Design a protein with these regions (language model features):
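Glycine-centered flexibility motif
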Residues: 73-76, 116, 214, 380, ...
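Basic- and hydrophobic-enriched, low-structure N-terminal and domain-boundary segments
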Residues: 1-99, 103-105, 152, 435, ...
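P-loop NTPase motor domains
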Residues: 87-88, 92-372, 443, 447, ...
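Conserved ATP-driven motor cores of ASCE-family P-loop NTPases powering translocation/secretion/packaging/pilus
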Residues: 364-471
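Short intrinsically disordered, low-complexity coil segments enriched in acidic
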Residues: 2-5, 417, 475
Length: 503
């Protein structure tokens, strides 16, 4: 028997043992009993279909055909009563590898999104299914400079990378993205905290000057590597940014050693702009479609952003594109009275492996109210802490209206946190005793136990997810892979067949 077959058998046996342990009466009862305890402690009735549909129509009266929300999973052991993420809610997910987050969440959300949909990923899994699911909608835009989906690598779209930059604040946000990506790539040994602040300010000023004057991204790197700041300083003064212009003048007048270190730091942060293959996707090209973030957020188009280096050039570009889209969405929402006419759905799949967005935690505090519905998928809590630092992760987790754990994680501290908020139940035991005279007495003892202890959360069976909402509700749901939904599976498979015929 081959080694691979033995591995398959071993995996099946392990899965069977895990499921049997969960469904047995040990360690606090069966799955059904656990769910009943959760429902008693944290009822989730406020997020079912009827109430979600009513809420959706109230929030988006000019979005005909809008559904109740994004499916998270099904309640109970049978039937199709679903738990939804509403159109004013953002979610945070932690799913271990191979747990079905893409098939049960991202692909399904792509099909359910009533307007524009965007996703990120570092692999091809789910990408073709998303394209097939949305083939009856608007255009599909694929940003794939690292040739993950298309080996040819020729740009199929270009974008104004700094379209969202219009003042010092937005320039600082984009500079922070490049800093975050480059910091991970360089590691601690490649950073000098003494000059990080000035280097970031220099990069921000050059980004602002390039955006105001309509320069290409490569110009920013030329300014920084040459050490000559007269050109960007002049541009900034002409556009009324006298403070940033004065800052550039000050950097130019620093002692040689200090100035050299500041420029070296800024050059490291802008290193993504040295990759010509990436910059081509941000340079207008005859015959190549130009992506307009403002038009996208008000459309029913699909945007797929692919990158493979968490800390580096690809992450910097993908994250900056996200910044342009989210900035455009906020502008559109404000023009429409504070909320998008039709929700923008953004599933940041593999966010810990693709994206560097320092502002993500802050955005979660108000994006939902604007109809910008974001779902961020991490493989571990550690990924979130790496991306946002501990405080940022805690802010993101707390600000999320829906929090989902899809299993497959062995982080005891994280699981203890979930166990604590899930709560306890009163476990009653009876004992009997017989006196010498033959009399029999019964005593009842009550002991508080965790509804979901750490070991049970760690062994969460495949196809199940722990969910908690900001309304206090919490439960275990059955995840809904698109392939197990006959109508959706038929639609997507038909689209996949059509794509094969075109190829």
């Amino acid at each position: 028997m081959s080694g691979s077959l033995w591995m398959l058998i071993g995996a099946l046996v392990l899965g069977t043992v895990t499921a049997a342990w969960w469904y047995s009466g040990r360690q606090g009862g069966s799955m059904g009993e656990t769910v009943k305890r959760l429902d008693r402690a944290h009822p989730v009735g406020a997020v079912d279909r009827d109430k979600r549909q009513e809420e959706a129509i109230q929030l988006h009266p000019n979005a005909p055909g809008i559904g109740p929300g994004l499916s998270i999973g099904a309640l109970g052991e049978h039937g199709d009563r679903r738990l939804y993420q509403g159109w004013r809610e953002c979610s945070v997910h932690v799913w271990g590898t191979g747990r079905g987050k893409t098939t049960s969440q991202v692909v399904r959300h792509a099909a359910e999104a009533p307007g524009a949909f965007l996703m990120t990923s570092n692999k091809v899994d789910g990408v073709t299914e998303v394209i097939a699911a949305r083939r009856d909608r608007g255009r599909v835009w694929v940003f794939d400079p690292q040739r993950i989906l298309d080996e040819a690598g020729e740009p199929t779209m270009t974008i104004d990378l700094f379209a969202s930059v219009e003042d010092t604040r937005t320039a600082d946000e984009v500079a922070a993205i490049f800093e975050s990506a480059s910091a991970g790539a360089a590691g601690a040994s490649g950073r000098d905290p003494q000059f990080d602040s000035q280097g970031r300010d220099l990069l921000s000023a050059c980004i602002l000057a390039a955006a105001e004057d309509g320069r290409e991204p490569a110009t920013i790197l030329e300014w920084i590597t040459s050490g000559k700041l007269r050109d960007p300083e002049t541009v900034l003064r002409e556009h009324g940014h006298t403070g940033r212009a004065a800052m550039l003048r000050g950097i130019s007048q620093q002692p040689d050693d200090t100035r050299g270190s500041v420029f070296a730091t800024a050059q490291r942060m802008a290193s993504a702009l040295s990759h010509d293959a990436l910059v081509r996707w941000a340079t207008p090209t005859t015959g190549v479609r130009r992506f307009d973030p403002g038009a996208f957020v008000d459309s029913d188009d699909t945007l797929i952003l692919l990158a493979q280096d968490t800390a580096g050039s690809g992450a910097a570009f993908v994250s900056t594109v996200l910044h342009t889209v989210f900035t455009a969405a906020q502008k559109s929402a404000r023009r429409n009275g504070g909320r998008l006419r039709v929700p923008l759905v953004a599933d940041l799949d593999e966010v810990g492996n693709v994206v560097k967005l320092p502002a993500l935690a802050e955005w979660y505090s108000y994006f939902g109210s604007m109809g910008i519905v974001v779902s961020a998928f991490f493989q571990t809590k550690g990924q979130g802490v790496t991306m946002l630092r501990h405080t940022g992760w805690e802010t993101l987790w707390s600000a999320a209206a829906v929090r989902v754990y899809g299993g497959g994680v062995d982080d005891d501290k994280f699981l203890e946190q979930l166990s604590k908020v899930t709560g306890k139940y009163d476990h009653r035991t009876q004992s009997y005793s017989t006196s010498r005279g033959g009399g029999r007495s019964t005593s009842v003892q009550t002991q508080q136990r965790e509804i979901l202890p750490v070991d049970k959360l760690a062994a969460l069976p495949p196809g199940r997810a722990w969910v908690r909402t900001n309304k206090g509700g919490g439960t275990i749901v059955r995840t809904l892979g698109w392939f197990a939904d006959p109508p959706l599976a038929a639609w997507i498979n038909e689209g996949l067949d059509e794509m094969k015929e075109v190829d």
